[in-house]
C-alpha cells in the first residue's frame, strides 16, 4: 500500500471517529428517552461513515476545502478553525448529561474534536467559495462615506431630539448589551454568548458587539443608538449599494427610498442586522456572473446566520429557499447554485442551529404560541403601507413585472424577487400579524426589485 493511500485511510478513520462522537451527542440530545442508547450509537456511527464516504466519493476536500491550495495557509486556517471549534463546542448545552456515561471525559473529548472538524470544514468551504466568488465592485468610497456621514448625523439628531421609551425587544437587547459590558471579557463570556444561541430566544449574538463598544464609551442611550447605526445599519446600506452598483448613485437612492431601515434601528431594534444579512444574500445569489457553487455555498451560510441573529427571520430563510426553487422554472441551468445553497444551508443550520430547528420549528406549535399577536390582515396591510409606502411597493412590482415580461436575462432574478416576499408574507401571516421590526423581512426583496431598473 502506498504511503499516501495509507495516510488518507488513517485520516478518514480519524475523521469518522471524531464525527461519530459529535453525531452521538447531537442525536442523544434529540432521541434519548425515545430510542435506546445502543441504537443511537449505531446511528451516529453510520451517519459519520456516510458523511466520510460521501466526502471521499465526491472528492470534497480537493474541490471545496483547499482555499489556498495544499499550502501552509490552508493548514493554518484549518488548524485555527479546528482549535476554536473544539474549544468552544456547545453540544453538551443541548441537554443535561447528569451522571450518564455520555457525559464523561472521553465522550466530551471526541465530541469536541468532531465539532472542531466540522467548523474547520465549514470555514474552509466558505473561504474557498469566497475566493472563487471574487471581489464585488462596490461604488466609490465617497458614496459610502456620504452614507456613513448622513447616518451618524441623523442618529445624533434623533437621539438629541427624541425621548423614546424602549420596551420589549429593543429594551431586551439594550439591557443584555449593558449586562455583557459589565462582565469580564474572557473565554467564559464567549461561551456564554454561544450558549445563549442554544438556550435563549433573544440570544446575545447581536448584543455582544454592542457591549464591546459600551466598554469604551459607556452604556447610555446615545452609545446604544450609535452602535446600532454603525455596526448594523451601515453594513445593510453597503448591501444596498452593492445591489444597485450598476446604477449611478444607486445605493444612495435606495437608502433614501427606504428610510424605515434607519428608523427601525433608531427605535432600538437590532433586527436591522438580520435585514442587512438578507440583503447581502440577494446580492450574492443573484450575481449570475459568478460561479454557481460559490454563490450557493455563501448564500446558504447567510441564510443560516440570518435566523440565528433573529429567530423570526427563519420565515425569510424558508421563503428564500422556496423562491429559489421556483425560479429554476425560468432558468434550469442555475440548479447547481440551488443545490449548493441547500447543502450549505442544511449543514450550517444543523451544526449551528440544531436546538432552534428541533425545539422551536419541529416541536412547537407556533399557531398557539403566537395566536394572541394575530390582529388580522388589515393591520398587516396598514403596517406595510405605513413603513414602505404604497407608491414604493408599486414601483418595485412594476420593475419585477417588466423584467418578467420584457427582459429574459432578468427573469430568474425577477421571479426570485417576486416569490420570496409573497411566500414570506403567506407564511408569516399564518402565525401572527406584523410588528414594526417584522417588516424588515421584506426589505431585502424590495431593494432587489428596485435595483432591477438597471436591466
Predicted regions and their residues:
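Start-transfer (signal-anchor) and selected internal transmembrane alpha helices
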Residues: 1-23, 34-158, 340
Amino acid at each position: 500500500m502506498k504511503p499516501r493511500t495509507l495516510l488518507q485511510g488513517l485520516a478518514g478513520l480519524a475523521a469518522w471517529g471524531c464525527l461519530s462522537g459529535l453525531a452521538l451527542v447531537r442525536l442523544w440530545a434529540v432521541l434519548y428517552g425515545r430510542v435506546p442508547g445502543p441504537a443511537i450509537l449505531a446511528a451516529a456511527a453510520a451517519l459519520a461513515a456516510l458523511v466520510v464516504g460521501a466526502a471521499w466519493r465526491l472528492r470534497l476536500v480537493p474541490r471545496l476545502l483547499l482555499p489556498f491550495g495544499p499550502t501552509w495557509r490552508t493548514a493554518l486556517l484549518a488548524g485555527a478553525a479546528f482549535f476554536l471549534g473544539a474549544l468552544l463546542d456547545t453540544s453538551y448545552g443541548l441537554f443535561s448529561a447528569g451522571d450518564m456515561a455520555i457525559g464523561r471525559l472521553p465522550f466530551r473529548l471526541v465530541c469536541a474534536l468532531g465539532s472542531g472538524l466540522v467548523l474547520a470544514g465549514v470555514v474552509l468551504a466558505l473561504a474557498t467559495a469566497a475566493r472563487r466568488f471574487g471581489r464585488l465592485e462596490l461604488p466609490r468610497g465617497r458614496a459610502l462615506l456620504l452614507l456613513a456621514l448622513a447616518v451618524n448625523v441623523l442618529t445624533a439628531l434623533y437621539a438629541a431630539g427624541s425621548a423614546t421609551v424602549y420596551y420589549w425587544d429593543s429594551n431586551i437587547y439594550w439591557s443584555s448589551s449593558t449586562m455583557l459590558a459589565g462582565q469580564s471579557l474572557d473565554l467564559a463570556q464567549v461561551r456564554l454568548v454561544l450558549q445563549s444561541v442554544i438556550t435563549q430566544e433573544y440570544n446575545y449574538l447581536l448584543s455582544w458587539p454592542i457591549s464591546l463598544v459600551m466598554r469604551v464609551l459607556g452604556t447610555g442611550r446615545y452609545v446604544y443608538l450609535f452602535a446600532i447605526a454603525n455596526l448594523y445599519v451601515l453594513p445593510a446600506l453597503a448591501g444596498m449599494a452593492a445591489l444597485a452598483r450598476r446604477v449611478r448613485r444607486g445605493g444612495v437612492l435606495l437608502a433614501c427610498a427606504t428610510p424605515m431601515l434607519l428608523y427601525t434601528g433608531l427605535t432600538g431594534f437590532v433586527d436591522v442586522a438580520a435585514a442587512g444579512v438578507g440583503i447581502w444574500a440577494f446580492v450574492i445569489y443573484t450575481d449570475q456572473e459568478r460561479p454557481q457553487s460559490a454563490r450557493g455555498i455563501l448564500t446558504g451560510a447567510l441564510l443560516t446566520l440570518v435566523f440565528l441573529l433573529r429567530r423570526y427571520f427563519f420565515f425569510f430563510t424558508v421563503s428564500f429557499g422556496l423562491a429559489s426553487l421556483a425560479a429554476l422554472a425560468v432558468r434550469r441551468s442555475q440548479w447547481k447554485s440551488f443545490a449548493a445553497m441547500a447543502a450549505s444551508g442544511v449543514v450550517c443550520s444543523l451544526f449551528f442551529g440544531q436546538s432552534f430547528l428541533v425545539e422551536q420549528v419541529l416541536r412547537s406549535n407556533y399557531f398557539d404560541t403566537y395566536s394572541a399577536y394575530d390582529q388580522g390582515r388589515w393591520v398587516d396591510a396598514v403596517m406595510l403601507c405605513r413603513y414602505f409606502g404604497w407608491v414604493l411597493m408599486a414601483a418595485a412590482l412594476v420593475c419585477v413585472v417588466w423584467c418578467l415580461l420584457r427582459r429574459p436575462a432578468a427573469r430568474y432574478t425577477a421571479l426570485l424577487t417576486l416569490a420570496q416576499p409573497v411566500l414570506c408574507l403567506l407564511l408569516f401571516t399564518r402565525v401572527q400579524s406584523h410588528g414594526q421590526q417584522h417588516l424588515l423581512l421584506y426589505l431585502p426583496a424590495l431593494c432587489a426589485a428596485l435595483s432591477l431598473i438597471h436591466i
